[in-house]
């Protein structure tokens, strides 16, 4: 059974979904739309009140001010990830789920997106799905490892680093 803000996912179908923001690995964006236009479109879908102000806030919070009047198709992968993060947060969800949010980024974009995700995590719950242990170390406080759909570990990051010989070693031992 999965709960989001005390509501059962699957049973109380609509309410939990409103409390979750999701950025999939392949970040499906409308490449022919402008950044601001796309975020407004997503905000309308979520029935965000004060849409214009929320779009402006998201553009600022993910650092898209300079890019906001460009077509998404003209953006770099790093800026497209920022658009994806903004759309995932446009309705101010309590929980943000990010699937491989840094894949394919260059080193500069990687540092920027990691920092952005860390700052987002100060205000809301962020769940990060990745197989890259360096990403976990850079962005996470808590680690949950899963093998064949079952949780095999759920610890603070420090415990893995200090007591289990590091994340990669723990991952090998727990998932082999």
Predicted segment positions?
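Conserved ABC transporter NBD signature motif
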Residues: 1-11, 15-16
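A short, surface-exposed alpha-helical micro-motif characterized by mixed small hydrophobic
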Residues: 136-138
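ABC ATPase "signature
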Residues: 154-155
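Conserved ABC ATPase "signature" region
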Residues: 40, 44-67
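Catalytic Walker B motif of ABC-type/P-loop ATPase nucleotide-binding domains
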Residues: 96-100
């Amino acid at each position: 059974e999965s709960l989001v803000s005390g509501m059962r996912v699957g049973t109380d179908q609509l309410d939990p979904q409103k409390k979750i923001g999701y950025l999939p690995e392949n970040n499906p964006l409308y490449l022919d739309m402008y950044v601001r236009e796309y975020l407004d479109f997503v905000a309308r879908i979520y029935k965000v009140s004060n849409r214009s102000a929320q779009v402006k806030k998201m553009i600022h919070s993910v650092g898209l001010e300079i890019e906001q009047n460009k077509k998404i198709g003209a953006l770099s992968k790093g800026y497209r990830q920022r658009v994806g993060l903004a759309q995932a947060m446009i309705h101010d969800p309590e929980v943000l789920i990010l699937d491989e949010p840094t894949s394919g980024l260059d080193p500069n974009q990687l540092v920027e997106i990691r920092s952005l995700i860390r700052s987002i995590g100060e205000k809301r719950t962020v769940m990060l799905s990745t197989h890259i242990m360096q990403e976990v170390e850079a962005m996470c406080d808590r680690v949950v490892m899963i093998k064949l759909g079952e949780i095999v570990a759920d610890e603070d990051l420090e415990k893995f680093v200090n007591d289990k010989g590091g994340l990669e070693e723990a991952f090998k031992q727990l998932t082999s």
